[in-house]
A protein has these predicted regions:
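Beta-strand-dominated extracellular/periplasmic modules and repeats
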Residues: 2-195
Length: 195
């Protein structure tokens, strides 16, 4: 209500959109270079550099563009630069551990990072988070590396039914380059996790 001359004037309110991220999600939300985790301040991180790439698709196979893909992971020694990691003070100061990329019109994303070490009690992995306009919640998943014996004992990997676990494992296309496609719905939907 608005007051006019001491009287309240009723005005019809226009409801906002249902998109949780908002109808005006930025067209440019990702800085150039935010998808390269291999160095901080021109100092190269420890460990083997790898590439992770993929395509994000809807249920019908349509690629999703302007979707924000974030990743976070441990450094080459399995340590996170985060206060919740009891050994975070020992983490590689040249490895930020977090990156962001936007999908192209073809739904493609790409990251350059370091092959993570295995954090205590876990298999080596990379965490993913997806955000875009119209998505009612942030989607989170985890990518595991192929051929790792520790996958079978990882609590997150084991939380997914056996028949769907392969959807969490990247495919190594050539040494050091991994493909991890993400599908938002349907029979081959990527398993997504709640907090």
């Amino acid at each position: 209500m608005k007051k006019k001359g001491g009287k309240a004037v009723r005005r019809r309110l226009v409801p906002s959109g249902e998109a949780t991220i908002g109808p005006f999600f930025p067209q440019r939300y990702v800085d150039a270079g935010a998808n390269d985790l291999t160095q901080v301040d021109d100092r190269r991180a420890e460990g083997e550099a790898i590439e992770i790439e993929g395509v994000v698709r809807q249920e019908d196979g349509t690629p999703l563009d302007n979707l924000v893909v974030e990743i976070w992971q441990a450094d080459a020694n399995g340590l996170y630069r985060h206060p919740a990691d009891p050994r975070h003070g020992e983490a590689d100061p040249r490895f930020f551990g977090w990156g962001r990329a936007a999908t192209s019109k073809e739904g493609r994303y790409a990251f350059r990072t370091i092959r993570p070490g295995a954090p205590h009690g876990r298999a080596r992995h990379v965490n993913f988070m997806l955000m875009f306009s119209g998505l009612m919640r942030i989607l989170k998943t985890t990518m595991f590396f192929p051929g790792e014996q520790a996958n079978e004992s990882d609590p997150v990997y084991r939380a997914v039914p056996k028949a769907r676990r392969a959807l969490l494992v990247a495919r190594e296309e050539v040494p050091g380059r991994y493909r991890f496609d993400l599908k938002l719905r349907g029979a081959h939907e990527t398993p997504f996790f709640d907090d």
